[in-house]
């Protein structure tokens, strides 16, 4: 017999922020994780679109961030957005193409109490010299290099 569980009142959101050193718009072997980068979590009501929750977090070693959310955000849509980079050479927020500066998700107990979000990346101003070799290995043409 199933015993009803009390509602979960805490969630952890975790993810990573990286420097896209090849401006590939995805992680490559040359990508570097950024400690000290800022991200914002914002949740909105699924029916009226009003903001219900906002939290800012910063990455630690290996570009990891971890946020504690104090209640279940059922029927809400949440979004993690890049807000700041600790690296002046890698602080461009991507706005073009299929990569967005944020990730959207639904936060609920169906997926457990820890939610791992896909990595978000800042674009490096100048690509690394080894980037063409990385794209060649992947069988791809470099984007606008």
Curated annotation (Swiss-Prot):
It comes from Ligustrum vulgare (Common privet). PANTHER family: OLEE1-LIKE PROTEIN (PTHR31614:SF24), PROTEIN DOWNSTREAM OF FLC-RELATED (PTHR31614). Its main location: secreted. It is found in: Secreted. PROSITE patterns: OLEEI. Keywords: Allergen, Disulfide bond, Glycoprotein, Secreted. Changing residue 51 to I: In Lig v 1.0102. Changing residue 95 to I: In Lig v 1.0102. This is Major pollen allergen Lig v 1. Disulfide bonds join 19-90, 22-131, 43-78. It holds the Pfam family Pollen_Ole_e_1. Belongs to the Ole e I family. The keyword Transmembrane helix does not apply. Changing residue 83 to L: In Lig v 1.0102. Glycans are attached at residue 111. It comes from the Eukaryota. InterPro entries: Allergen_Ole_e_I_CS, Pollen_Ole_e1_allergen. GO terms for cellular component: extracellular space.
């Amino acid at each position: 017999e199933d015993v009803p569980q009390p509602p979960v009142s805490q969630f952890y959101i975790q993810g990573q922020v990286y420097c896209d050193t090849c401006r590939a718009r995805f992680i490559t072997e040359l990508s570097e994780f950024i400690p000290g980068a800022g991200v914002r979590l914002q949740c909105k009501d699924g029916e009226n679109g009003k903001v219900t929750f906002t939290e800012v977090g910063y990455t630690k070693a290996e570009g990891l961030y971890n946020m504690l959310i104090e209640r279940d955000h059922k029927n809400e849509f949440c979004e993690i957005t890049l807000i700041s980079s600790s690296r002046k050479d890698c602080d461009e927020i991507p706005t073009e193409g299929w990569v967005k500066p944020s990730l959207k998700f639904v936060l609920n107990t169906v997926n457990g109490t820890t939610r791992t979000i896909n990595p978000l990346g800042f674009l490096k101003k100048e690509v690394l010299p080894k980037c063409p070799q990385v794209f060649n290995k992947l069988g791809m043409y470099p984007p606008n290099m």
